[in-house]
Regions:
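Acidic/proline- and glycine-rich, intrinsically disordered low-complexity segments
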Residues: 73-101
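Glycine-rich acetyl-CoA-binding "A-motif" of GNAT/NAT acetyltransferases
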Residues: 139-142
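A short, aliphatic-rich beta-strand micro-motif
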Residues: 126-137
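Short beta-strand-to-loop transition segments that serve as allosteric relay/switch motifs
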Residues: 135, 145-155
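Signal-transducing coupling segments at domain and membrane junctions
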Residues: 74, 102-127, 150-151
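Allosteric cytosolic regulatory segments
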Residues: 162, 166-174
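Signal-transmission linkers at sensory-effector interfaces
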Residues: 1-36, 40-43, 175-191
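GAF sensory/regulatory domain recognition
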Residues: 39-40, 51-84, 106-107
């Protein structure tokens, strides 16, 4: 089941498996973080598209995903599909790494599947800049993937864009850690 969340211009939020999410307040905080992170990612890099999916508990029960699209992509505002993590989106990217691909490199990449069954309805991928959002804990557990596409004016993403995205992902990971720890303390206090 997908519910649309958000309400900010450019946002498309997907709540994945909301019937199993047991903490609406946490879900609202995560939605706000996703919205702000996607919005900042676009502002910092000049991207026309940003997407971020996180799974705070690691079991898929409260997974959330946001897209933030420029006006150029208005026709994709109704696109609502649970991400399956295939193709480029399923690549393992180590904590602290960024993948930066030009459009030609996207199309030549062995993991590129042109969105499989969603090819006709998925927003196009015009270049790709992606990094994991990870916990600051020792295990650096990945919460999700922050990804951008289509730099304004047809430019390619730069090394500076990659650095800004990496810093933003680290900030988002630290914020998710704080949310996760606050929820754990709250649950422990209720017991």
């Amino acid at each position: 089941m997908n519910n649309v969340t958000g309400g900010h211009r450019g946002d498309v939020g997907i709540e994945i498996a909301p019937e199993t999410a047991d903490d609406p307040a946490l879900a609202a905080r995560i939605d706000d973080l996703l919205h702000r992170t996607c919005d900042l990612a676009r502002a910092l890099t000049g991207a026309e598209q940003a997407a971020l999916k996180v799974d705070l508990d690691g079991d898929g029960r409260a997974a959330r995903k946001f897209f933030n699209l420029s006006g150029r992509y208005d026709r994709y505002r109704e696109y609502r599909v649970d991400p399956v993590g295939s193709g480029l989106h399923g690549m393992h990217i180590a904590a602290g790494d960024v993948i930066r691909l030009t459009q030609a490199e996207v199309e030549q990449h062995p993991a590129w599947d042109a969105f499989g069954k969603q090819a006709g309805s998925h927003p196009p991928l015009r270049g790709w800049l992606a990094t994991p959002v990870c916990s600051e804990d020792a295990d650096r557990r990945p919460y999700g993937l922050l990804q951008l596409s289509d730099k304004t004016d047809g430019q390619e993403f730069s090394p500076d864009d990659a650095g800004r995205l990496l810093e933003l992902a680290a900030f988002a990971g630290a914020t998710l850690d704080a949310l996760r720890h606050a929820v754990a303390r709250s649950r422990d206090a209720r017991r």
